[in-house]
Amino acid sequence: VALLRAVLGDGDLHGRLRAMKRYFLLDKGDFLVHFTDNAGEELARRAPDISVSRLQSLLELSLKLSTASTDPHNDDLTCSLERQGIIHQLLSIHVTGGAKGYAPADADLDLDENAAQMTPKEALRLTGFETFALDYNAPWPVSLVLSRRAITKYQLLFRHVFHCKHVERRLCEAWQTHQATRAAAAQTTGAGDGGSLGRAYVLSQRMLHFLQNFTYYLMCEVVEPNWHAFETALRDAQSVDELVDAHERFLDACMKE
């Protein structure tokens, strides 16, 4: 009971969990907009050429300029660059026996270790957008709930949502470019949306529409319902073990859905 009080009271577990939702699940993603605007040029470079310390400085600046500036625990948020893309990271987890909680137990996957490893050439081609991840330094006793295993799941969820947001941003930039190109084409040929230019515009709009709906599904149909169930379980928890179990169920549900 004393440990439970320490986790919930002095450790401010509820506040830290809300922070994890804000940062890793982009519940309030205004800080990410600031960060992408400031760090976009750096993230577009090849991963080996990126300065992580510069990214960390830009992340801290973005937090100060966003609604997260009032979070007393935002100093515990850091960033890193993973050594592989998210697909290969998930494959590595599955192959090495860490797939429990990430994939159905009866998943029909016949993989070997070579399939899960990136070649050196593939790794060199990765950009910062493909390898960027957040990290969180949870102090004792909150680290009992926000364990390294739990934070790894948060990182996987973040990388997935971050990639969706990045692609959405690029599609919006493509739309802006298309507007300028269409205007130039109309002046020179007298045609606006005909031919291949029109088909490219329609395709980009369909892609953008799909991605926006997919992101909405992730946040409103997956994260929010599971989060509400998780909050109920937190209020009813009578021990730290029950807190950990409820947290793991929340993360596993988000990963699977």
Residues of each region from the PLM?
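Extended, charged interaction scaffolds in large complex subunits
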Residues: 1-257
